[in-house]
Amino acid sequence: MELIDYIIKILIDKKATDILLLDLRRLSPIADYFLIATANSIPHAQALCDEIELRIKHDLGLLPHHIEGYNPAQWILIDYIDVVVHIFLKEVR
């Protein structure tokens, strides 16, 4: 849960909204958790992604397995294997 708590703190610090944690452990072999948040603009979505990637790498020593959707940034997926972060623009979510 350390990774999840850390990502949630980053999302809150960077003004993401509608943060939702979905526990998928009993539902899907793909990931244990989906963490979903809303950004208010494309630059905001990209800044959230950048900050998560930078701080998790620096503070926890983890790199994402995959990042998808950075451009056009209407829906960015950051895959940390057990935790998958989804950052949506409000109109896409």
Give each language-model segment a name.
Residues 1-30, 40-76, 90-93:
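Polybasic/polar functional segments that serve as interface/processing modules
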Residues 33:
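Phosphate-binding and adjacent anionic-ligand microenvironments
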Residues 36-38:
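Short hydrophobic/aromatic beta-strand micro-patches
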Residues 78-80:
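Active-site beta-strand termini and strand-to-loop segments that position acidic
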